[in-house]
UniProtKB/Swiss-Prot annotation:
It comes from Oryctolagus cuniculus. The gene is EIF4G2. Belongs to the eukaryotic initiation factor 4G family. Residues 720-904 form the W2 domain. The modification N-acetylmethionine is found at residue 1. This is Eukaryotic translation initiation factor 4 gamma 2. Residues 78-308 form the MIF4G domain. The lineage of its organism: Eukaryota, Metazoa, Chordata, Craniata, Vertebrata.
Length: 907
């Protein structure tokens, strides 16, 4: 199959199709995974029977021949498909669709090959994406389905078929690897060769073509709307450790998919999403870090939505057209009539090949290649002059003074004939025919007509549409340049001027008017080109690292920070080299004194303040040095402690945050570097400052430990070993409070211990209340049901146990009321502590209800807190469903009792 796809020749019918394959050259397709399994040998029905050796050899030869024949048949099918795709045009669409369905798509392998060919063709030719999308719609409906009948989906949604599934899989693969081929060339340090520039241009066209093809398929409901939203979110999302200026390719793809399928997605249900997308695009549009071209693309896309998705005329007719439509557009926009090809006997090339025609006037047909065959003849051989059209042959009956306008064959510029060009005999002939009148006052008024603003132009081009008369080109603009160095001499500016802004053709004098001869025309102004300034190539990576080493060494010796910053500025380093330069700054100071390390940290902070480096640059540099730790530890054993100092100073100077530092160090990566960094922060600042900063960061400390140590007991042990247990005072309280209650359960002693050991700030913390209530409940349970007693949770406790439980709870009542009184939210936390305690004890019979009644009767918890606990919905504490089931009847009684009391008070 791969060979047939790679060869990609036209089918044997292509000779009679008439030049249909001129839109794209054959491409080599990559091998696809999963095809070889369809080409292997398959055992026959008698695989289990004993077969003589001679017969086996014959069967092996037969199987090999069958496999070869099968491969040849597949090759023939794929060649025929390639030929059909090469001939696909709007006129032949229905006919070629039937041919494609009848090529012999009888297996999933062949269908997959057809999809690969169609997708690759659509990626090569983005202008024809809508045509290939229509082809996919037809194949999705009519191609064989090898997956079997599927369950009925939602109404209005396309049924999933083999074709649709394989197509989406291929497009997903192209989308996920969209920038891979372009990045290969963008990451080169040296300038690209012309061949590499061409390959990069092809890769970029295929990347944008894939996005446009996805959008066209989305228009036809072949791709679900949710998939389109996922694509847009992926393109808008800023990746980790990716600079904003490196998002250009994704943002260009984003603009392409918005232009293609934006109107379909912008409906009432998705309005909030679209508003978020465009708010993000507006913010990116104002970012100076992005290239100007990307910012203008974003601006055009935002303006497109503001104008209710009505594109400018330049984008209206950007799809495939029939030949008749192209001819009609030429008449309407250019004033050029391009007749259909005639018989050779009906043509008269009097002006093009006559004896009086100057050599410069003979247009060369070769540069246009197959375009000339499609148009029938060259543009300019028949020129429109108002409502009538001057034909490409001379006839005396067409008017006494009418004649063809003469155009320069290279750029379509009006060229006044002179005596020296035509010769004496030619000059007399031209005068006798009145052709000199065509150039009277030719240069006047031409530039003023070009200066008018066109409605079809973007606002930023409204003041740039001024051209000289010798800059106008009538050649059809190329869709792209394969090589940036191959720039047309007279074409670049005219491609930005829409047809409505181009100057009108010069009118010939009316019939009967005497031509005025001998008038001089103003010569065109010659603009002097500014002298080319030779640009100094950017320094290489090795040069930058050497310069960085020199600057940093001088800075560490002299301490002049401003001189070091200016030295880095003068390097004019590309931004993608900054992380390695910062890594060099860190490494150079690692084996020096603490003062030098502090100087290096200050230099990095200054570079950020000057706008040279960013937080992402520092994190990339920091991680680069961490990756080199095994080598560095040979010469610098305490390298992780020194790196922790750099990280701590970066956090203090707000170069990075604790959460940004923690993210790449999760699951014990480079353990114990994160804890060493916290130690340095506590040393450089103070404990209270670090505790507040750490709590604001919302970092999960358990996740920062190796997986084997990710539990509370082990975490507390490690933190105590590093002197960081002050970060989690409640974790330490949970372990020590129960121990203190067992030593002396009197309320006075417990309250005094809490007051002496727990910060007053934590007395109103929900976590503290949870631990306090849990400790009391655990102590009561251990006293009522000692661990030595084997009690069944399903059996009811004795009267003595119930009385003991009540008396113990009464003894702790003063402490509970001290911390819970008038705090409904803390009372709800106390109820959740009771719920979790019962859950961990497997909900002993009647325990939850008994404690609810005790809390209510002893006025420890108010009615409002009980009802708030009932209505609260949270997944943080387990066992809520079973707990509600056990106390629901009592809570209902509580609600009715409260209502009766309120009614009595009202009476």
């Amino acid at each position: 199959m791969e060979s047939a796809i790679a060869e990609g020749g036209a089918s044997r019918f292509s000779a009679s199709s008439g030049g249909g394959g001129s839109r794209g050259a054959p491409q080599h397709y990559p091998k696809t995974a999963g095809n070889s399994e369809f080409l292997g040998k398959t055992p026959g029905q008698n695989a289990q029977k004993w077969i003589p050796a001679r017969s086996t050899r014959r069967d092996d030869n037969s199987a090999a021949n069958n496999s070869a024949n099968e491969k040849e048949r597949h090759d023939a099918i794929f060649r025929k498909v390639r030929g059909i795709l090469n001939k696909l045009t709007p006129e032949k669409f229905d006919k070629l669709c039937l041919e494609l369905l009848n090529v012999g798509v009888e297996s999933k392998l062949i269908l997959k090959g057809v999809i690969l060919l169609i997708v690759d063709k659509a990626l090569e030719e983005p202008k024809y994406s809508s045509l290939y999308a229509q082809l996919c719609l037809r194949l999705a409906e009519d191609a064989p389905n090898f997956d079997g009948p599927a369950a009925e989906g939602q109404p209005g949604q396309k049924q999933s078929t083999t074709f649709r599934r394989l197509l989406i899989s291929k497009l997903q693969d192209e989308f996920e690897n969209r920038t891979r081929n372009v990045d290969v060339y963008d990451k080169r340090e040296n300038p690209l060769l012309p061949e590499e520039e061409e390959q990069r241009a092809i890769a970029k066209i295929k990347m944008l073509g894939n996005i446009k093809f996805i959008g066209e398929l989305g228009k036809l409901d072949l791709i679900h709307e949710s998939i389109l939203h996922k694509c847009i979110k992926t393109l808008l999302e800023k990746k980790k450790r990716v600079q904003l200026q490196d998002m250009g390719e994704d943002l260009e793809c984003l603009c392409q998919i918005m232009r293609t399928v934006g109107p379909r997605l912008d409906h009432e249900r998705a309005k909030s999403l679209m508003d978020q997308y465009f708010a993000r695009m507006c913010s990116l549009m104002l970012s100076k870090e992005l290239p100007a071209r990307i910012r203008f693309l974003l601006q055009d896309t935002v303006e497109l939505r503001e104008h209710h998705w009505v594109p400018r005329k330049a984008f209206l007719d950007n799809g495939p057209k029939t030949i008749n439509q192209i001819r009609q557009d030429a008449v309407k926009d250019l004033g050029v009539f391009i007749p259909a090809p005639m018989a050779q006997g009906m043509r008269s090339d009097f002006f093009l090949e006559g004896p009086f025609m100057p050599p410069r006037m003979k247009m060369d047909r070769d540069p246009l290649g197959g375009l000339a065959d499609m148009f029938g003849q060259m543009p300019g051989s028949g020129i429109g002059t108002g409502p009538g059209v001057i034909q490409d042959r001379f006839s005396p009956t067409m008017g006494r003074h009418r004649s063809n306008q003469l155009f320069n064959g290279h750029g379509g510029h009006i060229m006044p004939p002179t005596q020296s060009q035509f010769g004496e005999m030619g000059g007399k002939f031209m005068k006798s025919q009145g052709l000199s009148q065509l150039y009277h006052n030719q240069s006047q008024g031409l530039l003023s007509q070009l200066q008018g603003q066109s409605k079809d132009m973007p606002p930023r081009f409204s003041k740039k549409g001024q051209l000289n008369a010798d800059e106008i080109s009538l050649r059809p603009a190329q869709s792209f340049l394969m090589n940036k160095n191959q720039v047309p001499k007279l074409q670049p500016q005219i491609t930005m001027i829409p047809p409505s802004a181009q100057p009108p053709r010069t009118q010939t004098p009316p019939l009967g008017q005497t031509p005025q001869l001998g008038l001089k025309t103003n010569p065109p102004l010659i603009q002097e080109k500014p002298a080319k300034t030779s640009k100094k190539p950017p320094p290489s990576k090795e040069e930058l690292l050497k310069l960085t080493e020199t600057v940093v060494t001088e800075y560490l010796n002299s301490g002049n920070a401003n001189e070091a910053v200016n030295g880095v500025k003068e390097m004019r380093a590309p931004k993608h080299f900054l992380p390695e330069m910062l890594s060099k700054v860190i490494i150079l100071s690692l084996d020096r004194s603490d003062e030098d390390k502090e100087k290096a940290s200050s230099l990095i902070s200054l570079l950020k303040q000057e706008g040279i480096g960013t937080s992402d640059n520092f994190m990339q540099a920091f991680l680069n040095v961490l990756d080199q730790c095994p080598k560095l530890e040979v010469d610098i054993p305490l390298v992780k402690s020194y790196l922790a100092q750099f990280a701590a100073r970066a956090i203090i100077s707000e170069l990075v945050s604790i959460s940004e530092l923690a993210q790449p160090l999760e699951s014990g990566t480079h353990f114990p570097l994160f804890l060493l960094c916290l130690q340095q922060l506590a040393k450089l600042q103070d404990r209270e400052w670090l505790t507040e900063l750490f709590q604001q960061s919302k970092v999960n400390m358990q996740k920062m430990l190796p997986e084997i140590d990710q539990n509370k007991d082990r975490m507390l042990e490690i933190l105590e070993g590093k002197g960081l247990s002050f970060l989690f005072p409640l974790l330490k309280l949970e372990k020590e409070l129960l121990k203190q209650i067992k030593l002396d359960p009197s309320p006075q002693t417990i309250y005094k211990w809490i007051k002496d050991n727990i910060s007053p700030k934590l007395h109103v913390d929900k976590g503290f209340v949870n631990i306090l209530m849990t400790s009391f409940l655990q102590y009561i349970s251990s006293e009522v049901n000692p661990p030595s007693d084997e009690t069944d949770s399903s059996s009811a406790p004795s009267k003595e146990q119930l009385e003991q439980e009540k008396q113990l709870l009464l003894s702790f009542k003063p402490v509970m009321q001290k911390f819970l009184h008038d705090h409904v939210d803390l009372q709800v936390s106390a109820l959740y502590a009771l719920q979790v305690h019962c859950y961990n004890s497997n909900f002993p019979k009647g325990m939850l209800l008994r404690f609810f009644v005790h809390f209510y009767d002893m006025e420890i918890i108010e009615e409002e807190a009980f009802l708030a606990w009932k209505e609260d919905i949270t997944q943080e504490f387990p066992g809520k469903g079973k707990a509600l089931f056990q106390v629901n009847q009592w809570l209902t009684w509580l609600e009715t009792a409260e209502e009766e009391e309120s009614e009595e008070e009202a009476d």
